[in-house]
Amino acid sequence: DWDVAFIKSDYQNGKDMWLIYAADGTKLATTDNRDYAFIVAKQNNLTPRSVH
């Protein structure tokens, strides 16, 4: 399904970060706030899914 965004946590530069990827693996954005990552996905008409 192509209307999904995958949200993945990562540790970068001493901070917890949240990476947002399209279903095809394209990196869309990075943020330091998990809630904001989900908001960004929804604002772009994507269904966010958490990836571990």
Regions found by a protein language model. Give the residues of each.
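Polar low-complexity intrinsically disordered regions
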Residues: D1-H52
